[in-house]
Amino acid sequence: MSVDDSADVVVVGAGPAGSAAAAWAARAGRDVLVIDTATFPRDKPCGDGLTPRAVAELHQLGLGKWLADHIRHRGLRMSGFGGEVEVDWPGPSFPSYGSAVARLELDDRIRKVAEDTGARMLLGAKAVAVHHDSSRRVVSLTLADGTEVGCRQLIVADGARSPLGRKLGRRWHRETVYGVAVRGYLSTAYSDDPWLTSHLELRSPDGAVLPGYGWIFPLGNGEVNIGVGALSTSRRPADLALRPLISYYTDLRRDEWGFTGQPRAVSSALLPMGGAVSGVAGSNWMLIGDAAACVNPLNGEGIDYGLETGRLAAELLDSRDLARLWPSLLADRYGRGFSVARRLALLLTFPRFLPTTGPITMRSTALMNIAVRVMSNLVTDDDRDWVARVWRGGGQLSRLVDRRPPFS
């Protein structure tokens, strides 16, 4: 087999996770090649919200000044079940603000950081096959046009469906809760509103309470990102027509937000969540971000996990036996939180759970403050307050009784 190009590190996927990994690897002096099927800038279905944890990662990448030119969000405005509450971003370990940037802009900006750091880009190219040596190390990739690309190490960041990950043995376990979502964009005079708005009482046109939420995330550019998402499992699939649902949700909020017309650029996504995949690493390769199901089961957020796992993967490139080290690192860092979050998210798929607990929770500001913190991945191992201790302890107990723990 002849090799047409090669790199020390090949990264497949130039979204936030892949570009972050490429940037950190290039900063360490490695020869990095990034391959992506798209040409940039390109859109991606997403809520576009950036939690304080994501903001912190962007600052580490050197994008703090760039982010300062975008909207700042104080926290979450949550409404439903007869109540509404505004909760500032909590937690001592992260910045006190979030933001929102359309993925069309965000992904290309992070990609340019990697490129400016020295990573080479091969865009508009699709990796379709992997080749191993006798010790099962990946030695090269085949692209759709027949080009062979050699590599010493491989980082796979090709998204929720992860076609290359599947070729490497990745398996998604759909009995664990997953998400379905749709989003679009609408113009409004309230695009500078400093709150990310979530409607927790999401109903279908016939009045049934759905296991999910609707959102309106101001972008500060004259538009908002509007969308709806729901939770599902193989046993209790969310039988939703997403595009009619976002249209219905838009009509419900039309007067309040001054919307005219229907959302543009409507796009949907399927989201493996909470580490509900196995086969995330081999001897010299790793899956990161959405490809490793690093998505929050309680809100569908994945950008902060993508940025973090990209950085962590780059830090492990000198290690041997990634097949053991990478799943262990993911489980240690995210396993407890993902386990208990999956369990809570599963409860939301039971029809009577939300109508029973929603009104009680919405009446308690203290409970909503706790909910925002844990739902937004703002608890760290260094936090010593009682909420952090209870969350970590609950996650540890939950993981002990998991039939299939995260990343296994």
From Swiss-Prot:
Molecular function in Gene Ontology: FAD binding; oxidoreductase activity, acting on the CH-CH group of donors; oxidoreductase activity, acting on the CH-CH group of donors, NAD or NADP as acceptor
NCBIfam families (alphabetical): GG-red-SF, MkRedMenJ
UniProt family annotation: Belongs to the geranylgeranyl reductase family.
Effect of gene knockout: Cells lacking this gene show complete abolition of the synthesis of MK-9(II-H2) accompanied by accumulation of MK-9. They have similar growth rates than wild-type in both aerated and hypoxic culture conditions. However, despite having similar levels of adhesion and infection at the earliest time point, the survival of mutant bacilli in the macrophages is dramatically reduced.
GO BP annotations listed: menaquinone biosynthetic process
The name this protein goes by in its record: Menaquinone reductase
Coiled coil: none
EC number(s) on file: 1.3.99.38
Cofactor(s), names only, from the UniProt record: FAD
Amino-acid positions noted as binding FAD in the UniProt annotation, renumbered to this chain: G13, A14, G15, P16, A17, C46, G47, D48, G49, R103, A127, D290, G302, I303
KW Transcription (keyword) present: no
